Amino acid sequence: MASSLCASSAIAAISSPSFLGGKKLRLKKKLTVPAVSRPDASVRAVAADPDRPIWFPGSTPPEWLDGSLPGDFGFDPLGLSSDPDSLKWNVQAEIVHCRWAMLGAAGIFIPEFLTKIGILNTPSWYTAGEQEYFTDKTTLFVVELILIGWAEGRRWADIIKPGSVNTDPVFPNNKLTGTDVGYPGGLWFDPLGWGSGSPAKLKELRTKEIKNGRLAMLAVMGAWFQHIYTGTGPIDNLFAHLADPGHATIFAAFTPK
């Protein structure tokens, strides 16, 4: 399962108060659904806090965002998650995007930094696809498509029917029990057993994951735009700014030379 942080409160969990006339009344009926249709049952056991942090102080969060979901700061100005099924999907979509973004951010910043200080010698993340590897790009793409497709297919099946993929396809005796959708746990995904704590502690850890994931999504997007306008990576830009903070700034990219 690129959270949303300095930015965490700004991009908090996808969900929203509807400010379009008539929409709110129409959606109230849709909210009368059993609680089991909402994801992360074990986390939702924590009662909603009326004094919980809100993305904008003084604002009223929508009914479908009661604070029981990790990373929920009552932000959904377009009502994208007003429908229970949409909320369920958006929760899982955000989790997986957060995790990919965190991996992506690590893949951008760490190799570039280690190359900058002379420990590694790797190409820029922006041009990594142009390099020659142990086989051709078509083979790499097909293998990646098969592996990722298999993993995403099982994730999709778990969303549709929670618990349906808890049995190891290779070793049927290995089974997971009591896991929430998007949080498989077990030896591979929770080797330290952090997911076995109290509901309050579990929600705290999941909220931290969402926040870091949202920050990572912003960081990856920032690195992308930065390379478009400067032609260099974030670490190179950082070192250049530290060496000449008066001139090496974001504004220099838009200044005619």
Curated annotation (Swiss-Prot):
Annotated residues for binding of chlorophyll a 3: 209
Transmembrane annotation, as ranges: 100-120, 133-153, 215-235
GO molecular function: chlorophyll binding; metal ion binding; protein domain specific binding
One Gene Ontology cellular component annotation held by this UniProt entry: chloroplast thylakoid
Compartments where found: Plastid, Chloroplast thylakoid membrane
Binding site for chlorophyll b 1: 55
Positions contributing to chlorophyll a 4 binding: 212
Inducers of expression: Induced by low light (LL) but repressed by high light (HL). Inhibited by cold.
Binding residues for chlorophyll b 4: 155
Binding site for chlorophyll a 6: 241
Segment annotated as transit peptide: 1-43
Keywords, alphabetical: Chlorophyll, Chloroplast, Chromophore, Magnesium, Membrane, Metal-binding, Photosynthesis, Photosystem I, Plastid, Thylakoid, Transit peptide, Transmembrane, Transmembrane helix
Family recorded in the similarity comment: Belongs to the light-harvesting chlorophyll a/b-binding (LHC) protein family.
Assembly and interaction partners: The LHC complex consists of chlorophyll a-b binding proteins. Red-emitting heterodimers with LHCA3 and LHCA5. Binds to carotenoids.
Cited function: The light-harvesting complex (LHC) functions as a light receptor, it captures and delivers excitation energy to photosystems with which it is closely associated, here photosystem I.
Name of the molecule in the record: Photosystem I chlorophyll a/b-binding protein 2, chloroplastic
